[in-house]
């Protein structure tokens, strides 16, 4: 059974955040485009463990799957429903900075996430007049939503996550559908949608290259 939380002050009024231990429940339908994000102990996928996977169908609700290692009484990578969704070729996974997320999900769960879209890549392709491509900036400027980043560096490996942590985690997926709609319009306007789609198809391979140590120096650098 999942734990249901309401966090109107941290996200938006009426938002439902559902916390699931270990895996998504059977029969959950999140639609054809699913916003996804991850929380980890750090930014090194070889060292830092995956702690939380957040998902949203774009309906104002968020589902958070807490990944608990077997050494701490959990099930580790035994999350068949989550992995089935991540690998489902008929469900698009929508990320912000997919490069990191697809790498950590491959490393932690052994799953290749596809197909994917990335709002950060899309923003960099069309918002060439600015360096503001972070999620907070994009949501404020394109969607009119101001999210808090106060819990960004908190302890995501804690056995019990606080309502504030879950509200922060949920905010990273609740508005991605709306953001993508704006960015897709800009990609079409600037004639760069096909280029963006080519970049998105490459992202799983980019994540695998990073895991193999090709991120520094970058294999595409001179």
What are these model-derived regions, one by one?
Residues 1-222:
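DEDD superfamily 3′-5′ metal-dependent exonuclease/proofreading module
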